[in-house]
Amino acid sequence: LITANIYVLCSDGDLQEGVSAESAALAGHLGLGNLIAIYDSNQITIAGDARLAMSENVGQRFEAYGWHVQHCNGHDHDQIVQAVEAARAEGGKPSLIIAKTTIGKGSPNKQGTSDIHGSPLGDEELAATREALGWEHSERFYVPEEVREVFANRKAENIEEYEHWQELFSQWQSAHPEKAKIWNQHWEPPYGEDQL
């Protein structure tokens, strides 16, 4: 019933934090094979170039924690899919996919710099980026109809999968009432909303 993978998207800045070492070491120790972290390795943080404060080999660090580590081009969807499939097949240990990217790819004057991290492009750079990427739409926050259709179809598939899972879960609860009681206790807060 509970066969889901847990996905993490993390950045250079995230992996500089001490808590990443503690949690990654524990995940490796416990062999959390359904945990897949995709590391957007663009060597940029909000404060500037990540190499100003980070020089370790992240892949080797995670291998030392007992993780399955892969590298891919973060701009190549096929490579990402292959890496995720390999991570799911690994099963016995958590996986780190180091996806090498260029932050702001396509922005002629800001890509690869911290100027694009958490900051708007501005009208001129936005126009230059649209041109560089061959994006013919000038509307802000525009989503083409074919993209909307893809998401609408996926939403329908997700609803169908969820309803099927709910049926299986209901059958499991009926067959295992004591375990179901424990399960439900974990999803109920130990206090009421009025106590928050």
List PLM regions with ranges.
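Thiamine diphosphate
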Residues: 1-5, 71, 148-196
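Glycine-rich ThDP/TPP pyrophosphate-binding loop and its adjacent helix/strand module
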Residues: 1-153
